[in-house]
Amino acid sequence: MGLWGKKGTVAPHDQSPRRRPKKGLIKKKMVKREKQKRNMEELKKEVVMDDHKLTLEELSTKYSVDLTKGHSHQRAKEILTRGGPNTVTPPPTTPEWVKFCKQLFGGFSLLLWTGAILCFVAYSIQIYFNEEPTKDNLYLSIVLSVVVIVTGCFSYYQEAKSSKIMESFKNMVPQQALVIRGGEKMQINVQEVVLGDLVEIKGGDRVPADLRLISAQGCKVDNSSLTGESEPQSRSPDFTHENPLETRNICFFSTNCVEGTARGIVIATGDSTVMGRIASLTSGLAVGQTPIAAEIEHFIHLITVVAVFLGVTFFALSLLLGYGWLEAIIFLIGIIVANVPEGLLATVTVCLTLTAKRMARKNCLVKNLEAVETLGSTSTICSDKTGTLTQNRMTVAHMWFDMTVYEADTTEEQTGKTFTKSSDTWFMLARIAGLCNRADFKANQEILPIAKRATTGDASESALLKFIEQSYSSVAEMREKNPKVAEIPFNSTNKYQMSIHLREDSSQTHVLMMKGAPERILEFCSTFLLNGQEYSMNDEMKEAFQNAYLELGGLGERVLGFCFLNLPSSFSKGFPFNTDEINFPMDNLCFVGLISMIDPPRAAVPDAVSKCRSAGIKVIMVTGDHPITAKAIAKGVGIISEGTETAEEVAARLKIPISKVDASAAKAIVVHGAELKDIQSKQLDQILQNHPEIVFARTSPQQKLIIVEGCQRLGAVVAVTGDGVNDSPALKKADIGIAMGISGSDVSKQAADMILLDDNFASIVTGVEEGRLIFDNLKKSIMYTLTSNIPEITPFLMFIILGIPLPLGTITILCIDLGTDMVPAISLAYESAESDIMKRLPRNPKTDNLVNHRLIGMAYGQIGMIQALAGFFTYFVILAENGFRPVDLLGIRLHWEDKYLNDLEDSYGQQWTYEQRKVVEFTCQTAFFVTIVVVQWADLIISKTRRNSLFQQGMRNKVLIFGILEETLLAAFLSYTPGMDVALRMYPLKITWWLCAIPYSILIFVYDEIRKLLIRQHPDGWVERETYY
């Protein structure tokens, strides 16, 4: 049996690669893929090892090592040659040029490149067959290429800080390790540590490999980055737990030794360590496409289908109408390019960037632009507990003295004014908590509030120190008046801490003070303090103690007991107290009370969880902490709502076995990590489907990953929060990984898509709102942009079908798409949310697309058609004013385009030269362009909302007002600036020609207000089903 114990699991020290016979290339690839898949499945399995169960003799035999002298130098060299260095294999990284190419040629850019190439092809055909071709298609090709390159560079720059997960794993590796080889202690590079090496660690060291301890003195390790446990964990040679992650005789690679010393045997190195497996798991995970990327891909397919369909239809139609095949090809290319919204790529990029900047101001740092929108699609949030839902600092929550439970202040401000302080018992309790305490404030922090001051010492002692400093008096003064003369530090065997102090009165005697596990403290006591008076311990007191202990423990709080003894006068000042061979009394102490501590919820979290619930988002707690604590916090923040019961609580209330509880009666469930170990996918799916309120406690990194995959399997868009190394696989696998900026490890930050700078869960809800808003606003922006496609395409179609002079040229289309439409489209990114944004269910990425048939129907079939009518109305008005009635324009195209025909007659017999005709044609094209700008005013205003009336939403978006002014001034500038007739073929217009479009603008506004009114009055009615995009 290997180190991992079970068949089908990876043995960490089986580090020699197996040889395979050479096979064909295709088969090799298939084998490789299958192997990768199998490896990933094995990585997801729980850590299985038996080294923690072995006796020292068995350990010595297994690794062929002397437990006092270690390996010989020769033996260590052989193992190093065979097993390889003690390093974590870095994953293959994507080269920067590949990332840049993805920005330049991926997604929407591909559509624009296609447009640019088609334009160039059209220009080449014109050059080949015409003596003096127009250069419109060449200009269009160049402009499209520039647009793609500029926006590609911009996007690459925004996402240049891509995640390099293994960098921080490298940083975590200690450089030197102290090993014993051939009976001698020696410092070696950590890469040279081998399986079976005898290693020594001390406080402040990082553990160089996975170790099985054979001896330890007061050793504590910080496993928080690996298991999520906030308290330092004691380490000893004893086998204390079946689970290798929880037993005390294993130390894990790259965790920190906080205090004490230990000696151990290396049982895994490099990739085979628990941390190495997490690294492999994180870097080997396949990351899916972001919802917004999928939406843009869907949009491209849609636009491409529409463009090709129209292009091919009119190519066939132009051939039927008698055009030559070359002209028909030019038409085909022209129609396809006219369908490409050139400005949309830049608009989407700028919208996402603006939102990312806005979120950064709200403490959400977005590493991947597309993650902004993903957060808005989120339907499930798997949140870590410590530091995300809680304040990440132990705080005194309750006290029990004088037979009464008192509540302390756990708010983030901590005023400490919530209970009576007149009792002598409280006076004694405060003194013990302050004196029998090794924590201290760091220097030069007097100006900071007590709650914000940094301390030395463990979390519980620091909590007591701050609490006494706030609620009683200066601890430093108290310690000065009562100097410590002897101490027994807390250890996991004794489960108490004892200190002896000189009394501050003039008696020159000592007081012994003790704190520790309540049941242990009670064993030392024969009396108790009640209202300052000492009484003999009795059954009533013991029962009251037991009830208080159970009540506070049931709240998920860490409870400590406190007692004291005034030592007799024979132990006066100068007595040599010996804590190794006890020479003073340690029995018949006086019990004072209990103090309980908890890492309290953040103030803003309950409201944030409530907002998630009303927004249809399921919040699941996934923590490495104890189930009782996890459940208490879940109830405190509303993940388990008031009145909701678990199966255990229903069973207790009805006094029936759990097996008889109706599953539908228990809406909430607390799942222990041990239960998840052997659970099947179907059973996990049932838990996730049947319980709206879920807490997973004591989970391992692999289990967090399995939970995320389970949610995704059920179709959820999953956001995961985490701060430890243990969270990084789940962060990477999630649709959006959210790391903690303050408490987060480097690994978690680099596996994540987004970082919460203030570590606050409430910031996620802000992010969800921003994500939904950007999706709404992108929809509005696309709706606005696509609408002008119809008045851009129809002139070309009428030019082919009706044979009229071209109403709108290529250059003027570019002026709309990359000029007048850009700022207004971007201004919609600044639009504030509609009132229902956090009250509707999360969008379904499969059905609720960014661009759906209803949006296309509105943009192309309704608003776009009104705009096209406006354009043609202006076009025919100008030509009529110049003598060409609409009916006489039909079929005039060939004569109109004939350069050698200089006596073309209008409806009134006036003759027009080719030059004169072109001036009128370009004036009409300028007027058509201006008309589109005027009707786009109305389109922009109606795009502000999808359901609400403009009168509900208001006109508070100043950027949008600026957008209307900008497009109007730009249109005027292009029309009236001298020289534009040569540069862009734009001519000055009469003021009355600007007014032709006003009635159509009013029509668009009134039409859309009536549509939205019908949607509001008849939810789920025909109008909503067909037009609510």
UniProtKB/Swiss-Prot annotation:
Active-site residues per Swiss-Prot or TrEMBL entry: D384
Membrane topology reported for the UniProt record: Multi-pass membrane protein
Residues on Cytoplasmic side: 1-95, 161-296, 347-778, 830-849, 945-957, 1013-1029
Location of region: Disordered: 1-37, 223-242
GO biological process terms, semicolon-separated: cell surface receptor signaling pathway; establishment of localization in cell; fertilization; flagellated sperm motility; intracellular potassium ion homeostasis; intracellular sodium ion homeostasis; monoatomic ion transport; potassium ion import across plasma membrane
InterPro entries hit by this protein: ATPase_P-typ_cation-transptr_C, ATPase_P-typ_cation-transptr_N, ATPase_P-typ_cyto_dom_N, ATPase_P-typ_P_site, ATPase_P-typ_TM_dom_sf, ATPase_P-typ_transduc_dom_A_sf, Cation_transp_ATPase_P-type, HAD-like_sf
Localisation per UniProt entry: Cell membrane
UniProt keyword annotation of Cell membrane present: yes
UniProt-annotated binding residues for Mg(2+): D723, D727
MF terms in GO: ATP binding; ATP hydrolysis activity; ATPase-coupled monoatomic cation transmembrane transporter activity; kinase binding; metal ion binding; P-type sodium:potassium-exchanging transporter activity
Catalytic reaction(s) noted: K(+)(out) + Na(+)(in) + ATP + H2O = K(+)(in) + Na(+)(out) + ADP + phosphate + H(+)
Subunit structure: The sodium/potassium-transporting ATPase is composed of a catalytic alpha subunit, an auxiliary non-catalytic beta subunit and an additional regulatory subunit.
Protein's UniProt name: Sodium/potassium-transporting ATPase subunit alpha-4
Protein's organism: Homo sapiens
Taxonomic path: Eukaryota, Metazoa, Chordata, Craniata, Vertebrata
